[in-house]
From Swiss-Prot:
Residues annotated with Tyrosine amide modification: 36
Protein name: Pancreatic polypeptide prohormone
Protein's cellular compartments: Secreted
Keywords: Amidation, Hormone, Secreted
Maturation propeptide residues: 59-65
Pfam family, one: Hormone_3
One GO cellular component, as annotated: extracellular space
Additional facts recorded: May be used as a marker of the viability of xenotransplanted fetal panreatic tissue in the immediate post-transplant period.
Gene encoding the protein: PPY
Taxonomic lineage of the native organism: Eukaryota, Metazoa, Chordata, Craniata, Vertebrata
UniProt induction comment: Induced in hypoglycemia, and, in vitro, by carbocal, in fetal pancreatic cells.
Amino acid sequence: APLEPVYPGDDATPEQMAQYAAELRRYINMLTRPRYGKRDEEDLLDLKCSSLHAAAPRELSPMGA
């Protein structure tokens, strides 16, 4: 994983802040970029539905008598 850029401090020059902003943008893009090929959409949909079901509170789940 890429390293998070270090904040240059409140007394940094505008150039340092601009460089930090650019590095931070690159870092966030690396972490949040979509990863294709791991699962197809149907599997992802099944995964979302099953995790929603698993996360439902027990009170809402049907109880066997």
